[in-house]
UniProtKB/Swiss-Prot annotation:
It comes from Brucella melitensis biotype 1 (strain ATCC 23456 / CCUG 17765 / NCTC 10094 / 16M). Coiled coil: none annotated. Catalyzes the reversible phosphorylation of UMP to UDP. It holds the Pfam family AA_kinase. This is Uridylate kinase.
Length: 240
């Protein structure tokens, strides 16, 4: 790790599905270990890292609502799924000597600390990787929105969205071979075109707080370090 990073502090958003690997459900420990190693490489560059992980590999609140159930209860279940994923990532980080802490938007003191903006930034100043669990702590908000919110609260230089593909495309490249990848977009263009990268609330929050969004493939070994050094394939969303 000799390259100079382009960012001092970042928020990494990973989907819960990213942790499944090829299993189709739950957590593939080897995938969690690989993501942890990518974060370790980022720390070796001197970059402060916060993380938000979704819970879709375990449970989705909207699945309850779609079958006539209570959306609020479903979302609470989804928030608990993010706590499970966050604990798994913390375990993988600790195995390779990376100091990390889980801060939950839902109080559960026997399991992890509760979130506060002041404590989160203090931990990051100390060099710890901070994993934000429990979404925003409120129903009806996605973990994408939680990622944008936490990025604003910790004053991150960039919000990195690790996805299944290497950027934002004009259409789903897995379904449309003619889909083209964008090198750069503005927040407004993402919203106006309805590009499926993050929900509109998350993109709008990032725009209002002038937060740079970088979309890249989370499946590339060392991909995070490459992005932090201004290398690698990605799409940058910025109004500057």
């Amino acid at each position: 790790m000799t390259g100079k990073p382009a960012y001092k502090r970042v928020l990494l958003k990973a989907s819960g599905e990213a942790l499944m690997g090829s299993q189709g459900f739950g957590i593939d420990v080897s995938v969690a270990d690989r993501i942890a190693n990518d974060i370790k490489q980022a720390r070796a560059l001197g970059v402060e890292v916060g993380v938000v992980i979704g819970g879709g590999n375990i449970f989705r609140g909207v699945a309850v609502a779609s079958k006539g159930g209570d959306r609020v209860t479903g979302d609470h279940m989804g928030m608990l799924a993010t706590v499970i994923n966050s604990l798994a990532l913390r375990t993988s980080l600790h195995k390779i000597g990376v100091d990390s802490v889980v801060l939950s938007a839902i109080a559960m003191p026997e399991i992890c600390e509760s979130f506060s903006q002041r404590q989160a930034t203090a931990y990051m100043d100390e060099g710890k990787v901070v994993i934000f669990a429990g979404g925003t702590g409120n129903p009806f908000f996605t973990t994408d929105s939680a990622a944008a919110l936490r990025a604003a609260e910790i004053e991150a230089d960039a919000l990195l969205k690790g996805t299944q593909v290497d950027g934002i495309y004009s259409a789903d490249p897995k379904k449309d071979p003619g889909a083209t990848r964008f090198e750069q977009l503005t927040h407004e263009e993402v919203l106006d075109r309805g590009l499926a990268v993050m929900d509109t609330a998350a993109v709008a929050l990032a725009r209002e707080n002038n937060i740079l969004i970088i979309v890249y493939s989370i499946h590339e070994n060392g991909g995070l370090a490459d992005i932090l050094q201004g290398k690698g394939r990605c799409t940058i969303v910025s109004d500057n």
